[in-house]
Amino acid sequence: MTRKLKEPHRQAVNGAYLSVMNWFFCFPRKEVSLNDLRDEVSVFDERYAKTTIRTAVSQLENEGFLQRQVLGRTWRITTNLSHSYHRSFKVGHNLTIVIENGIIEDVLEEYPQARAIILFGSYRKGDDTEESDIDIAVEISGTADPQMISLGALEHFGYRRKVKINGLVFSREKIDLNVFANIANGIVIYGFLEVKP
């Protein structure tokens, strides 16, 4: 006999599923117990019941995203860093947070002449970790030499705090070809980045 979840419980499990996934996107190298995970994901979200978190963890484990080791009565939960969610869902997660936090507007305020703003590096690829900084490239007109700048820090990046934002301001005329190739493989979040063969 198959039992269906009642609608409020199904919504809680779906919310917990996303919260657990997002927590491991923010802390991909951490090992955590079930109780600690429940406390961690309840910081921003509603307070989830332990059984709801257990259901979400089991579902993500069945999908291969999480790995669980049972140590007596305790679970040690880690994420599978080679799972496709780190290259698909995590990139979308990162992009959403970057855009929703007003980074584009902040860059345009500082560089109104920006031709393009690009998210590149580890956040673009989805292989960022707890220690990673956000890398933003800003293309401007002219012949200025490339310049590394600090764009401040995001107070909250999902479950992480105070994530630094590094900027690379460059003009097409003065950028190293290898650096430009890295930027060109990023995601254009404002304007248009012309890539000439």
Spans of model-derived segments:
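Short beta-strand->loop micro-motif that forms the acidic, two-metal-ion catalytic signature
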Residues: 136-139
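Short helix-loop-helix/strand-helix junction enriched in hydrophobic and basic residues
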Residues: 116-123
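Catalytic core of pol beta-like nucleotidyltransferases
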Residues: 1-113, 125-131, 141-197
